[in-house]
């Protein structure tokens, strides 16, 4: 049996979603990293690298290994049975975002080669095939939506996960603007657009839900207090069963119109409230992108 201090972070996801950026972030954090490892070599590689490179290893796999990807869940179960701590991250983005990134970089999608189709196919078709091939891995991983974040932000977020990785369930609270789309990595989504909006108060418009005048304004509203209480009750009831089901992460997304006031306020308050019992992380999609 391997030492129980061995920690593996597996990075998979859509082509163009930022897997290389995430891997570089882990390398900066002290992980020994390898890119595009064939899935059938995973267990042997982990055993070898544990002997030579210490207790923290990060591995990136992509759809170029698609024919062997069904082996990965079984390999991960085997490693966990040997006492290895395994975390699986899946990077994703909207199809429109991926198309734009491929257009900007002028790179060819790895599935566009003839051996997959017998003839060239359009980018949209290859992305659709890739989603189908990676669906099972996505279902078993912590999903990170990179659609609205830059490379430096993604690196920072992946690094922020590091202290939480060895623990049990981690709660990720994320604020967002509905006008920019619902985060694809959300496990639960709460719509708070019906709450009083500080945007229409001239003295609060340029502030955020972190600022005390906005906090004071929102806490005076009965419906804001009720919303917070209802979300707290829901999460308080279901987090323990989720943790017992071996979930490593739960992402709670809270959205308002602009992602600046109401959703930010609730993310800050809920993260503070649940931090006594769970490891919590905070993401403000629209604020972090400024």
UniProtKB/Swiss-Prot annotation:
Residue numbers binding GTP: 62-65
GO molecular function, one term: GTP binding
UniProt cross-references to Pfam families, sorted A to Z: PapZ_C (PF22740), RapZ-like_N (PF03668)
Binding, ATP: 13-20
Keyword Nucleotide-binding recorded: yes
Keywords of this entry: ATP-binding, GTP-binding, Nucleotide-binding
NCBIfam families: PRK05416.1
Function according to Swiss-Prot or TrEMBL: Displays ATPase and GTPase activities.
Database matches in HAMAP family: RapZ_like
Protein name: Nucleotide-binding protein Aave_3603
Organism for this UniProt entry: Paracidovorax citrulli (strain AAC00-1) (Acidovorax citrulli)
């Amino acid at each position: 049996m391997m030492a129980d201090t061995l920690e593996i972070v597996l990075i998979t996801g859509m082509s163009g979603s930022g897997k290389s950026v995430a891997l570089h972030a882990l390398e900066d954090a002290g992980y020994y990293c390898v890119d595009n490892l064939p899935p059938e070599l995973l267990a042997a590689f982990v055993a070898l690298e544990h002997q030579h490179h210490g207790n923290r290893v990060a591995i990136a796999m992509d759809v170029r290994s698609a024919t062997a990807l069904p082996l990965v869940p079984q390999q991960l179960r085997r490693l966990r049975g040997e006492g290895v701590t395994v975390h699986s991250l899946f990077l994703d983005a909207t199809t429109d975002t991926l198309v734009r990134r491929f257009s900007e970089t002028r790179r060819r999608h790895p599935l566009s080669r003839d051996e997959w189709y017998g003839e060239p196919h359009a980018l949209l078709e290859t992305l659709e095939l890739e989603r189908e091939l990676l669906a099972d891995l996505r279902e078993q991983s912590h999903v990170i939506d990179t659609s609205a974040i830059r490379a430096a932000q993604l690196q920072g977020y992946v690094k922020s996960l590091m202290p939480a990785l060895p623990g049990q369930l981690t709660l990720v609270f994320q604020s967002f603007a509905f006008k920019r789309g619902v985060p694809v990595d959300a496990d639960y989504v709460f719509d708070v657009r019906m709450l009083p909006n500080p945007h229409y108060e001239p003295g609060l418009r340029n502030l955020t839900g972190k600022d005390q005048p906005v906090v004071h304004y929102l806490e005076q509203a009965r419906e804001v207090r009720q919303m917070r209480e209802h979300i707290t009750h829901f999460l308080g009831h279901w987090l323990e069963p989720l943790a017992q089901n071996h979930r490593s992460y739960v992402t709670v997304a809270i959205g308002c119109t602009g992602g600046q006031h109401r959703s930010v306020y609730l993310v800050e308050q809920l993260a503070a409230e649940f931090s006594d019992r769970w490891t919590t992380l905070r993401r403000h999609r629209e604020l972090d992108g400024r």
